[in-house]
Every structure is written in structure tokens, then in C-alpha cells.
């Protein structure tokens, strides 16, 4: 994010989806990907009776959001954690259930804008890419230690990179001469290995590789796989989980979790649903919602967003 004036993707639609549970007195939203707090600010401004627990693994984002949201006083609580730690966070805060959980996945514009974090490929910077810069392996560690087959798998699965094997082989060859430490050298390698015709389509040639490395460094899919069921379990009756994803693998994972949670627990050919077998959750969005052309023109990042929401209708356990 370039600053507090940044408007999150699909903000109005997200707030509308959150409105039914958050209009209740004493309602609590967990903003599981706080960032600079754009969603939280909108919620606290719109819903006078709501409180927000904001989770972020990035200490810098948490500090900036805390300053931005200070005018709301004790209606906002910031927590340094990864969002799959949601059950522990709620237990520490003494919350048995919440009214809504929001995820806005992927790297924030703020992280892209800080050169030293190494998320962006437009400027030469240390190959870090950790959302929490105090712990875990860096992108340089991945490039310098992973076997060629593992590098190729990451690039293919997380980056959907057609030239994954070629790039992985080049990384292994070049790191034998000198370990990778900076993004500029990796970008040069990608320009050399990706054929010119392919470089002219599909955006910057480094985009897919940098995305794949970021997802690997931060274990994003595994974290999300644990977090979505935890969020569904955390909401009370009438509560909603809302997710914005920007990668096909993320959206597929969210879709599968939502469909499984809202599935009928009876044979498909049964002509009626017996009492007690109704699904405890329902899909709120019809498929994945997308941004319109006007928003995409103002914010190109919105082009890849996929928005889904689910609501708990009874106390029964999720599938």
C-alpha cells in the first residue's frame, strides 16, 4: 500500500457482505490479514457497535495499522500472529466465537513498496520476501539450497511458470558460481532463460517466479489450508467468512473448503432433507465474484481478485 489513502480491492462489496453480522451489538470481526488496516477502518467507521481483532504476521504492517486505527480506541485490537493461529488468538482474547472473519490474501502494496523486503522485481534488493522478517528462510535460502526438481515444482505449481525446469536448472548452475543474494541478479537470469516471444506476453517475466518464491517462503497455501476451516469453526450463527484471493490455487482451496462445509449430509437421491441433516453453512456468493472494469482501471491488482463468502446458519459442525 502506498499509504493510508490506499483503498482495498472491492472494499464496498466486502463491507456489504460483512454488514449483516456486524450490525449486531457487540459484534466482532477478525481481520485476519490486517495490512495497513483499510478494511478495518471501513468497518469501524461504518458499524459503530463492532469491534475488530486485526491479525498480521508483519510487525511493520501491524505498527502502521495500529497508528492509523488509534482513533478507534479499544474497538481495535492488533495481534502479531499468522492467520492459521486464529484459534489460539481467540482463546487468548477469551472469545468463544466471532461474527465474521475476513481474509485479503497475498502480498500487500506496502510490502511491495519497501524495497528492502525483496518482494518487488522492479528494483534491485535483498532476496528476502518474508512477511515476518524476523523468522524463517528467505527467498535467497530457497534459491541457494533447494534441489532443481523442487525449484521447478515450486515455480510450476505456485507461479504457473511454463519454463520452470529451464529456470530451475539455470538457478542451480549459477548459484554454483556465486550464491544468489539480490533480486536484480535473479531478474537478469529470468530475462536470459525465458524466450523473447514469451517475455512479450503475460506481464513482467519475473512476476511468476517472484510470486512462487513468496508463496514458498511464507508457506502460504499450507497456512491458508489450515486457516479457512479454523475461521469457519470460529463464527457463530449468522456469522460470515469472506475471502479475497488473487491466485488460482488459493481460490480453488477456498472454494473446496466452502463447498465441503455447505454440503448436504444426505444421499443425493433422497427426495427430502431429514431434520437434523441440514447443512450448518450456506454459500453467500454465487461462485467467485470479480471486480468490474472501472475498479480494474483504477487498481490493476483488482483484475485477479476472486471474492467468496460463506455464512453459518446453524450450530452444527462444518463438514
Curated annotation (Swiss-Prot):
Keyword Protein transport included in the entry's annotation: no
A cellular-component GO term for this protein: cytoplasm
UniProt xrefs under InterPro entries: RsmH, SAM-dep_MeTrfase_MraW_recog, SAM-dependent_MTases_sf
Keywords for the protein's UniProt record, in alphabetical order: Cytoplasm, Methyltransferase, rRNA processing, S-adenosyl-L-methionine, Transferase
Position of the signal peptide: none
Top-level taxon of origin: Bacteria
Cellular localization per UniProt: Cytoplasm
One of the Pfam families matching this protein, by short name: Methyltransf_5
Binding site residues for S-adenosyl-L-methionine: 37-39, 56, 90, 104, 111
E.C. numbers: 2.1.1.199
EC main group: transferase
A biological process from GO: rRNA base methylation
GO terms of molecular function: rRNA (cytosine-N4-)-methyltransferase activity
Reactions that this protein is recorded to catalyse: cytidine(1402) in 16S rRNA + S-adenosyl-L-methionine = N(4)-methylcytidine(1402) in 16S rRNA + S-adenosyl-L-homocysteine + H(+)
Role according to the record: Specifically methylates the N4 position of cytidine in position 1402 (C1402) of 16S rRNA.
Family named by the database record: Belongs to the methyltransferase superfamily. RsmH family.
NCBIfam families: 16S rRNA (cytosine(1402)-N(4))-methyltransferase RsmH
Protein's recorded name: Ribosomal RNA small subunit methyltransferase H
Organism, as annotated: Nocardioides sp. (strain ATCC BAA-499 / JS614)
Gene this chain is encoded by: rsmH
Amino acid at each position: 500500500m502506498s499509504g493510508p489513502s490506499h483503498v482495498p480491492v472491492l472494499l464496498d462489496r466486502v463491507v456489504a457482505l460483512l454488514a449483516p453480522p456486524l450490525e449486531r451489538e457487540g459484534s466482532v470481526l477478525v481481520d485476519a490479514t490486517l495490512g495497513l488496516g483499510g478494511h478495518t477502518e471501513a468497518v469501524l467507521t461504518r458499524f459503530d457497535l463492532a469491534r475488530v481483532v486485526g491479525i498480521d504476521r508483519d510487525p511493520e504492517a501491524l505498527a502502521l495499522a495500529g497508528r492509523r486505527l488509534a482513533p478507534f480506541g479499544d474497538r481495535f485490537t492488533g495481534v502479531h500472529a499468522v492467520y492459521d493461529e486464529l484459534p489460539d488468538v481467540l482463546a487468548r482474547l477469551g472469545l468463544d466465537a466471532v461474527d465474521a472473519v475476513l481474509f485479503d490474501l497475498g502480498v500487500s502494496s506496502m510490502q511491495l513498496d519497501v524495497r528492502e523486503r525483496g518482494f518487488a522485481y522492479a528494483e534491485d534488493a535483498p532476496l528476502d520476501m518474508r512477511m515476518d522478517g524476523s523468522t524463517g528462510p528467505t527467498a535467497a535460502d530457497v534459491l541457494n539450497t533447494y534441489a532443481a526438481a523442487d525449484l521447478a515444482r515450486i515455480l510450476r505449481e505456485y507461479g504457473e511458470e511454463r519454463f520452470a525446469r529451464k529456470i530451475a536448472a539455470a538457478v542451480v548452475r549459477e548459484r554454483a558460481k556465486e550464491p544468489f543474494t539480490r533480486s536484480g541478479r535473479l531478474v537478469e537470469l529470468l530475462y536470459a532463460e525465458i524466450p523473447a516471444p514469451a517475455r512479450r506476453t503475460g506481464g513482467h517475466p519475473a512476476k511468476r517466479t517472484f510470486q512462487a518464491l513468496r508463496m514458498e517462503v511464507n508457506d502460504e497455501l499450507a497456512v491458508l489450508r489450515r486457516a479457512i476451516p479454523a475461521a469457519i469453526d470460529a463464527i457463530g450463527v449468522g456469522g460470515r467468512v469472506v475471502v479475497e484471493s488473487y491466485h488460482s490455487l488459493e481460490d480453488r482451496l477456498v472454494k473446496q473448503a466452502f463447498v465441503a462445509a455447505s454440503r448436504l449430509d444426505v444421499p443425493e437421491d433422497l427426495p427430502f432433507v431429514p431434520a437434523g441433516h441440514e447443512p450448518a453453512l450456506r454459500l453467500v456468493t454465487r461462485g467467485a465474484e470479480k471486480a468490474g472494469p472501472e475498479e480494474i482501471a483504477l487498481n490493476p491488482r483488482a483484475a485477479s481478485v476472486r471474492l467468496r463468502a460463506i455464512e453459518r446458519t446453524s450450530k452444527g459442525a462444518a463438514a
